[in-house]
Design a protein with these regions (language model features):
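Structural detector for short beta-strands of small beta-barrel domains
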Residues: 7, 20-22
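GHKL (Bergerat-fold) ATPase N-terminal catalytic module, capturing the glycine-rich phosphate-binding loop
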Residues: 86-263
Length: 776
């Protein structure tokens, strides 16, 4: 007799009742399950998505019930389950015993296949030795309780190590049937409907079985264990005990478990006991590894407090939000993401069902802070809410809805992960810029410390950097101050100074002066980040001809903004800074070959170097009264950079003492230069200058200036130079003779001969100021 589709359903379920979770709104059951707690499948092999409506107001919302069932419909394409009554709370013991019986009945190839699957899973979940601690934390997080307002209640977690066991207890929601079924199998999909969970396919939890041969759970009225020695007694065929739940009475527990179970507070709703295959103390380094890392709780949404108790020593770990800057972003799963999932599944890649229904992706960043300073992190890993072993080599934490491998060794080379990493780079650019959106929000240099270097790496780092670069070009992300106003500007509007003139450590020109002189519409980066290596690297990558500032631009400023530039460079300190910069950059020659009228004279005027004497200090001792006739380099500028200016001394005006002497003497009477020589010292000095003036082999061979104010030995101006003599003993005696009129002989002041005496003697003697020589 041919079987109907209903007969096939009955044959599959082999039970008069099924199980479902009750929803008070509209009064129905869903998440339909068989007597062993397994999800009922449709004829296409996928879990059935049906609602079984009932009329019963006494049931509790969210609780699982078992009820007698029936089927209405005409074919496998058109049927639905119905409730025939006999609604009761589930018999937890019976459900576990049914499941255990099903597993124990596996024979031959079924048993071998199950064992091989378990071995494969063990290999997949075997990563770093401490991975199982992560998974226990993950399970603590994934089902927090809610308060009366629907807000999540923070979860507290305890790890307790005793002689033989590692215990995990937490205050999250108690286990329900769905949770129990999930840990009794793999890929049951208990989290597929809850996209907020950080676990993703139930396999991670299986890591607790890698080094433990006994795992006990007490939660939500469930008491069960997974026990290798019970399932596989010596001499029996080996079975995959990790999926065989054993209903456990309190009398089945040893005193060590009972003691801890009785000691925990009532707010702890989940109790695990893990017995190590060798020595429970082997858990200690793994606990230390995980909880020595103060980053461990950053991305776990609901766990806020953990206690680790080893040998009665308590270590407390709290989520310190004051220490961390954490930013979450949500990306909608668009058509591109959906196509990636579709393509990955066509390739045969494992994509958890949770991701097939996910509508939004979370990308998060975190970094520590100390006051207003951001503190970059070292040796960071990529997070999938808990850390993987995959490095990204960035100074901050990155967390996202990646698909990791179950061992958390790294990220599989999936297009989904690459796409998220690309988008993460873009979101990082936005987050990074937001840290600078207001002045004094954070120390700007420390914000730039967050930037990774732009060099390549593995595929995930490359994707991240690619996404970052693409986004950073389009957003305002570089801080500037202009006209006293702080703001962010796009990179394309930031001046890329290749000259170093605006270098923050050796700034030649103040920002305000630069803007006032150059009239540039583009902006200089904030001085706090201008010399930061990451900023320099970014500018180098994104520089264009349009925003590059080179030495040609400096020349343009000097020539095209002449009035403003001259006003600025007339300041002595500015002039020194500008020359120091040109010399340091070895650009002085090339610049002054084009424009050079920015050399500061001692008079305060600006000149080209060929119009200025560089150093005539030794001559001005004698002819300082004619300084206005001798344009020279500003003394402070010259002396500050004397060594540097030697490299261009040929550019300055040459000082020829002989020509200067001739010019002054020629114009002496016409220009009334005598009025400048208004004391003995000046008169002495100028005569000395004339006497020693030389240019090569040439000397001054001209006359004395007419009406030159010579001073006699009494310090008075001599009115008749023809009566002026150099004093010697003969002349002195002669003047004393009684028959000699004293006015006939005037002796020139002896100061004229204090320096270079012979030269001055000779010079004056040749110009009719001799000694009185007796004629015989």
């Amino acid at each position: 007799m041919e079987m109907s589709f209903i007969d096939y359903i009955k044959k599959e379920l082999q039970s008069s009742y099924i199980i479902g979770v009750y929803h008070k709104d509209n009064s129905y059951f869903d998440d339909l399950r068989g007597a062993a707690g397994e999800r009922i499948e449709d004829f296409d092999g996928k879990p059935i998505e049906q609602k079984v409506y009932v009329s019963n107001d006494n049931l509790i919302d969210g609780e699982y019930y078992q009820f007698d069932w029936g089927v209405e419909g005409s074919s496998i394409y058109d049927y639905h389950y119905t409730c025939l009554g006999n609604i009761n709370s589930i018999d937890k013991r019976r459900m576990l015993e049914v499941r255990l019986h099903e597993k124990m009945e596996q024979r031959g190839t079924n048993r071998k296949d199950a064992n091989q699957n378990q071995e494969m899973i063990n290999r997949e979940v075997t990563g770093a030795p401490h991975t199982y601690i992560y998974e226990l934390l993950q399970n603590s997080n994934d089902y927090p309780q809610k308060d009366t307002n629907g807000n999540y209640i923070p979860v507290s977690v305890k790890f307790i190590l005793t002689e033989h066991y590692l215990f995990l207890v937490h205050s999250g929601a108690p286990f329900n049937l769905r949770n129990i079924a999930a840990i009794c199998t793999v890929n049951d999909g208990e989290k597929r409907e809850n996209i907020e969970t950080i676990g993703y396919k139930g396999m991670g939890f299986k890591s607790v079985f890698v080094n433990n041969d006994y795992v006990y759970l007490n939660s939500g009225g469930w008491s069960l264990r997974f026990d290798d020695k019970y399932i596989n007694p010596e001499g029996s065929y080996k079975r995959n005990w990790q999926y065989m739940p054993i209903y456990t009475e309190m009398s089945d527990l040893d005193n060590e478990i009972i003691a801890v179970l009785n000691s925990i507070s009532n707010d702890m709703n989940v109790f695990f006991a893990l017995r190590h295959v060798r020595d429970a103390k082997e858990n200690i380094p793994n606990l230390e590894k995980v909880f020595s890392d103060d980053k461990i709780l950053v991305f776990i949404p609901h766990v806020y407090h953990v206690e680790v108790i080893v040998n009665n020593n308590i270590k407390k770990i709290d989520k310190d939000r004051d220490k961390w800057i954490v930013q979450d972003y949500t990306i909608q799963v668009d058509d591109e993401y959906k196509q990636i999932l579709k393509d990955e599944m066509l390739k045969g890649n494992k994509i958890p069902e949770k991701f097939q229904k996910i509508t939004n992706i979370t990308i998060s960043f975190a970094v520590t802070k100390e006051g207003e300073k951001i503190v970059p992190l070292k040796d960071t890993k990529i997070y999938n809410y808990l850390p993987t072993e995959q490095p990204l080599y960035v100074p901050f934490l990155l967390n996202a809805d990646f698909v990791p491998d179950a061992s958390r060794k790294g990220l599989p080379d999936l297009e989904w992960n690459k796409k998220i990493m690309f988008d993460a780079g873009g979101k990082f650019a936005i987050w990074w810029a937001s840290l600078m959106d207001t002045e004094s929000k954070f120390d700007l240099s420390s914000v730039f410390d967050l930037l990774p270097d732009m060099t390549g790496g593995d595929i995930f780092r490359n994707k991240f950097i690619e996404g970052f670069k693409q986004k950073i070009e389009t957003i305002k992300c570089i801080p500037v101050v202009r006209d006293g106003i702080y703001k962010l500007e796009q990179l394309s509007n930031i001046i890329y100074d290749t000259t170093g003139m605006m270098d923050a450590n050796n700034q030649v020109m103040a920002d305000e002066d630069f803007y006032n002189i150059s009239k540039y519409s583009k902006c200089l980066a904030h001085s706090e980040i201008r010399n930061h290596p990451r900023f320099i690297e970014i500018q180098r990558i994104f520089a264009t001809d349009d925003n590059t500032f080179g030495f040609d631009n400096i020349i343009s400023i000097i020539t095209e903004c002449k009035d403003e530039f001259h006003k600025w460079v007339k300041d002595i300190n500015n002039n020194i800074s500008f020359f120091k910069f040109l010399f340091a950059k070895e650009k002085i020659t090339s610049v002054i070959s084009t424009v050079s009228d920015f050399f500061l004279a001692e008079s305060g005027e600006l000149c080209s170097p060929e119009k200025l004497y560089f150093n005539i200090d030794e001559y001005l001792v004698d002819i300082g009264m004619f300084e206005d006739l001798l344009p020279r380099m500003n003394i402070k500028v010259r002396d500050t950079l004397k060594k540097e200016f030697k490299s261009i001394d040929g550019k300055f005006k040459h000082f020829n003492p002989v020509d200067i002497a001739k010019n002054i003497v020629e114009d002496f009477e016409k220009s009334d230069y005598a009025s400048r020589i208004n004391d003995l010292k000046k008169s002495v000095n100028f005569i000395h200058f004339l006497a020693v003036a030389r240019e090569g082999s040439l000397t001054y061979d001209g006359d004395l200036p007419k009406e030159y104010p010579f001073y006699d030995e009494n310090g008075k101006i001599c009115k008749d130079v023809n009566l002026l003599f150099r004093k010697d003993k003969f002349g002195e005696d002669l003047k004393k003779r009684v028959w000699m009129n004293s006015e006939w002989i005037t002796f020139i002041h002896s100061d004229y001969f204090n320096k270079d005496t012979e030269d001055v003697y000779k010079f004056l003697e040749n110009r009719n100021i001799p000694v009185i020589t007796p004629r015989i």
